[in-house]
Amino acid sequence: MVKVKINNKTYNVQELQFGDYTHMESQGISITEAFSRGQMTLTAMAFTCVVLKCDRAEAERVVTQHILGGGSMFDITDAFAEAVKQSDFFKKMLGIETEEPKKAQKKKTEEENQAEETEE
């Protein structure tokens, strides 16, 4: 579970799921585009929509107050990045590789090495 402090209030964020993704899209936000283009403001707003279970206008208001109150956009985007790391669904949708393929590749390499040693 990820914790994020937005506008001086701390929220516990459950694992991001399909419904969270569709909530972002229902607010007119393509999180895949925003993420791939590095649009941090849009990403922060989309994540705020999910965390607060609110619409885009309310998220804009809250993020604005967060920044005016001395908070940083990175408070929100860093928490989003951590939440994405914990969500298999969001990692897949955003095209983020997991560690498993690397392990599989390493295992394949070890097996190839053993085969080469056997051939010699």
Predicted regions: what they are:
Residues 2-10, 19-21, 26-35, 56-120:
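Charged interaction scaffolds used for protein-protein
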